[in-house]
């Protein structure tokens, strides 16, 4: 018994030394990690700060501002989604909401080269898709309800989103900074795609038409359509800034021709408009419409 205790006492210094070695190694690890975190922060923080600075840095040499309409000046996509939900309920015996919505998107995409965008094109796709998913079994009274759903989108009030009218009114009266002509003001335009009469009616119902020098409604927002807009506004591409919610339609093609762009995401996006986003020196991102005044 005494021999066992004696041997144990002899091992105590060794055990203590091992523990101290482990503690020392752990402390050294923590110190290295702390130093590494600081180094990483030194590398990362300037990037974040520079990115944030670039996002709010004022755009230069701008003489004309073009605005998208739907989901930029007024809400629209959420109404389309409500109609689509009711539509899927009407056709629930022929498939799940997910299946019918997927089939509808496919039908819309197929019809776009011939029908373009807008409520009327959407209504035709609703009817065509109903016939397709039901294999021709959908009843006439259901078709009538579907047509009514589509037509309901033609009578939206197009109420301007928060901050829109106040901001546009400010820009309408604002003098261009660093312009050769001290009294030169921005040219304002609505640049939107869709069906002509529907878009014109929404603009009039919104009450915003009086602020704009040019209203251009196109079948699609291609780079060439942006170049035509520049000619109509009598500005060079690098003197134009496009403001909109769709990266695919409002941002990417504008940047492609050398214009600037301001992206204001809407809370919901049509599946057809979803695309990969990227950064660009002439791109600014804002979350509220009023922030447009900070980048111009």
Where do the protein language model's features map onto the residues?
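Cationic, amphipathic, low-complexity segments that mediate targeting or membrane/lipid association
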Residues: 38-40
